[in-house]
Amino acid sequence: MGKKIKKEVEPPPKDVFDPITIESKKAATVVLMLKSPEEDILAKACEAIYKFALKGEENKATLLELGAVEPLTKLLTHEDKTVRRNAMMIFGILASNSDVKKLLRELEVMNSVIAQLSPEEEVVIHEFASLCLANMSVEYTGKVQIFEHGGLEPLIRLLSSSDPDVKKNSIECIYNLVQDFQCRTTLQELNAIPPILELLRSEYPIIQLLALKTLGVITCDKEARTMLKENQGLDHLTKILETKELNDLHVEALSVIANCLEDMDTMVLMQQTGSLKKVLSFAESSTIPDIQKNAAKAIAKAAYDPENRKVFHEQEVEKCLVTLLGSDSDGTKIAASQAISALCENLSCKEFFNTQGIPQIVQLLRSDNEEVREAAALALANLTTSSPANANAAAEADAIDPLINILSSKRDGAIANAATVLTNMATQEPLRAIIQNHEIMHALLGPLHSTNTLVQSTAALTVAATACDVEARTQLRNCGGLVPLVGLLHSKNDEVRRHASWAVMVCAGDEPMAVELCRLGALNILEEINRSLSRKNKFSEAAYNKLLNNNLSLKYSQTGYLSSSNIISDGFYDYGRINPGTKLLSLKELCLQELNDQRAILLVNNKSDTSPPPSMEDKSSDVGYGRSISSSSSLRRGSKEKANAIFGSPTEEKSEPASVRNTILSRAFTKEKGVSKKKSRLQLICSSYLLWKGKGKKEEEKVKEEEEILALPKFTEGSPEKEWNPPPDPEFCVYVLEVTKSILPIVNLKEQIEVLAKYVADKMGGKIPKEKLADFSWELHISELKFQLKSNVVPIGYIKKGIFYHRALLFKALADKIGVGCSLVRGEYSRGWNEVKLVNEARKGMIGNLPPPEEYIVDLMFHPGNLLKLRSKEADLYRFL
């Protein structure tokens, strides 16, 4: 045998690195290993980083600071499955950190992550890729990237995965994505509802819960509800409700059912299958507040459909809701109240709550929870709308007091609802009186000052409903409510402006309120509104006319016209023509002005501090106007004697100096100017006057005159606190008495007008021929009256030489007193006239449609008593120069 030769060991290649085992305890070292070209090292480094990231948020932040994210993103596309899997596991954990999510969006790794969802990949990769997407989908920008890169379809496919973690992550991501409408639409196109319904059979509650939440979102769309119904989704939901062990899913299941009940077809189907009855019974018997609340919400959502309301009524849903009102949960009370509000659109439902439900709702008005009070007030508002019976039931349940308390609530919705209920109640007079006794006007002061348009609108409407009598309007004025009410007329909101106009129209129902509203600028605002085609409304026009019709002095000054329905009352004054928007001073302000050379202000006042003596009544009782001038003159002399005894004659020439006479007269006429004078001062003046007047007279005559002077009205001695009254006009009082006794009994209207015209002409200077009109010195007479009265205001009865507009005003004032309809028109150049309507005597008694009455102008100047047909030549000559 030959000798064995020993083989020589070959040395290792020079370019091969000797293996080295490294143990590192620093994350930074491992992060550096992510750049290694060796697959084994990459896999081990990723595994170590995964374990490190699992330990907490601080470690995730550390990895981000060490720059681990960017090299890891490159490993998502590595050829080695282990490296790729381990890198994906890291991102599944790291993506819960908000800073990491932000960086991942910037690095645009979404395509790489979604690619890991392909069927060829391992289940572990599916798990962590879906987990990464679930974390990324929490933020809106992440949702957009997932959707735009086609992530929805593979996620839906993974719902059928055998791994529960994959299912859980996928349905969670889908739930986040479907918050966006576009994703919901795409989900339906991808037929995602069947696999989602299948998840309801899962043995894992979290998967079932996420599936129900997803269905609760997507069934907000009608198409999704249809697909759910076609795939027997309602059966799945009903079974969940019937299973007590799944009580943690009942709330979400009811939310899905609530959406489905919005469809009439679904409602009918549930009614036919008995599912609806089961749902209502379940809600009524449940002791879980959230279940009761969601059941009530389901009813409320479905009840907005008219057909659904009918079905609910057939299922006696009202009883269920009344039971829910007694829940201990405020949320359930709110939801039940809202459901009742929706059901009230159905008349049968509204009638049911008349006997049951309203007392329970009224109790909720006293709740400490303001949201409960708001919901209860909403239910009561809908229950009482167009339902006097329910309004009475609410009042009987003592709802008025808590409703008025709610008007001071901090929640605008509660205030608006409470105001609506009070408005509905106030349509009935007995309830309105009760509401007024609770100081409703003072309670509305806060809502009228609100900046919320809904509160403003309802508050103004409540004012319109409750300010129907003088006491309520006075209460509103005294508490300062007119100022904010007028301010609401400036609103840019159409409903606020309309309701404010309505309230102003109601408040202008009496003259003092109309005058006050005009003083606050309501008339000017309404005039401006009515000039705008876009802002005006029927109520603004009606309010404007109502203000003028109850403030005739302003109306006549602005428009120069009073219709036959505009009845002149005591205190009316003719200031003369003013331009629209110009402020008209009050009568008191005009009376207190210094004497000026402007046009005299004519006053109509039948109220007097003194009354005609009994002898006057006796004398005038047998006097019919038109018998003789002497009879009329005797009456006039009697009235003059009375007036002279008090004021001094304004027309007769006196032998005493004018200064003494005018001093006494002015103090008797304008009580404001003599308020501060003491009685001793007045007696001193009167005594001086009597001493001067009594020279050469007998002692008994002096005593008589002294008694007459001391019989002056006592307003010269009044205190400053005494209420101001317009200057009295005893002459006009006599006129009213005379025409009432002599002209009112006349049966024929035309004869009444003619006799009254002659009477007025006689009191104002008699017949004036046209050719002597220029010689009729009425201006001097008026100036003398102003000087004697020391006032710019002249009572109409004092005028004995009157021109057209004086006579027309006196005719209108007297005609209104005896019920003779006539209008008053202001012309140019001191012209004024009255228009009357008369039926043609020849057509009286004829059968069939009668022609309209003819209009005439009453001649008070040239031929007193003549009736001039309107628009005739004679009438035009009377009206115009």
UniProtKB/Swiss-Prot annotation:
<dbReference type="GO" id="GO:0034517">
    <property type="term" value="P:ribophagy"/>
</dbReference>
<dbReference type="Pfam" id="PF14381">
    <property type="entry name" value="EDR1_CTR1_ARMC3_pept"/>
</dbReference>
<feature type="repeat" description="ARM 7">
    <location>
        <begin position="264"/>
        <end position="304"/>
    </location>
</feature>
<feature type="repeat" description="ARM 5">
    <location>
        <begin position="181"/>
        <end position="220"/>
    </location>
</feature>
<feature type="repeat" description="ARM 2">
    <location>
        <begin position="57"/>
        <end position="96"/>
    </location>
</feature>
<feature type="repeat" description="ARM 9">
    <location>
        <begin position="346"/>
        <end position="385"/>
    </location>
</feature>
<keyword id="KW-0072">Autophagy</keyword>
<comment type="function">
    <text>Essential for male fertility and sperm motility. During spermatogenesis, promotes the autophagic degradation of excessive ribosomes, providing energy resources for mitochondria and thus ensuring sperm flagellar motility.</text>
</comment>
<feature type="repeat" description="ARM 1">
    <location>
        <begin position="15"/>
        <end position="54"/>
    </location>
</feature>
<feature type="repeat" description="ARM 6">
    <location>
        <begin position="222"/>
        <end position="262"/>
    </location>
</feature>
<dbReference type="Pfam" id="PF00514">
    <property type="entry name" value="Arm"/>
</dbReference>
<feature type="repeat" description="ARM 12">
    <location>
        <begin position="470"/>
        <end position="509"/>
    </location>
</feature>
<dbReference type="GO" id="GO:0030317">
    <property type="term" value="P:flagellated sperm motility"/>
</dbReference>
<dbReference type="InterPro" id="IPR052441">
    <property type="entry name" value="Armadillo-Ser/Thr_Kinase"/>
</dbReference>
<feature type="repeat" description="ARM 3">
    <location>
        <begin position="98"/>
        <end position="138"/>
    </location>
</feature>
<feature type="region of interest" description="Disordered">
    <location>
        <begin position="605"/>
        <end position="659"/>
    </location>
</feature>
<protein>
    <recommendedName>
        <fullName>Armadillo repeat-containing protein 3</fullName>
    </recommendedName>
</protein>
<feature type="repeat" description="ARM 11">
    <location>
        <begin position="429"/>
        <end position="468"/>
    </location>
</feature>
<dbReference type="InterPro" id="IPR055164">
    <property type="entry name" value="EDR1/CTR1/ARMC3-like_pept-like"/>
</dbReference>
<keyword id="KW-0744">Spermatogenesis</keyword>
<keyword id="KW-0221">Differentiation</keyword>
<keyword id="KW-0449">Lipoprotein</keyword>
<dbReference type="InterPro" id="IPR011989">
    <property type="entry name" value="ARM-like"/>
</dbReference>
<dbReference type="InterPro" id="IPR016024">
    <property type="entry name" value="ARM-type_fold"/>
</dbReference>
<comment type="subunit">
    <text>Homodimer. Interacts with PIK3C3, PIK3R4 and BECN1. Interacts (via ARM domains) with ATG14.</text>
</comment>
<feature type="lipid moiety-binding region" description="S-palmitoyl cysteine">
    <location>
        <position position="518"/>
    </location>
</feature>
<keyword id="KW-0564">Palmitate</keyword>
<feature type="repeat" description="ARM 4">
    <location>
        <begin position="140"/>
        <end position="179"/>
    </location>
</feature>
<feature type="repeat" description="ARM 10">
    <location>
        <begin position="388"/>
        <end position="427"/>
    </location>
</feature>
<feature type="compositionally biased region" description="Low complexity">
    <location>
        <begin position="622"/>
        <end position="636"/>
    </location>
</feature>
<dbReference type="GO" id="GO:0007286">
    <property type="term" value="P:spermatid development"/>
</dbReference>
<feature type="lipid moiety-binding region" description="S-palmitoyl cysteine">
    <location>
        <position position="507"/>
    </location>
</feature>
<dbReference type="InterPro" id="IPR000225">
    <property type="entry name" value="Armadillo"/>
</dbReference>
<keyword id="KW-0677">Repeat</keyword>
<feature type="repeat" description="ARM 8">
    <location>
        <begin position="306"/>
        <end position="345"/>
    </location>
</feature>
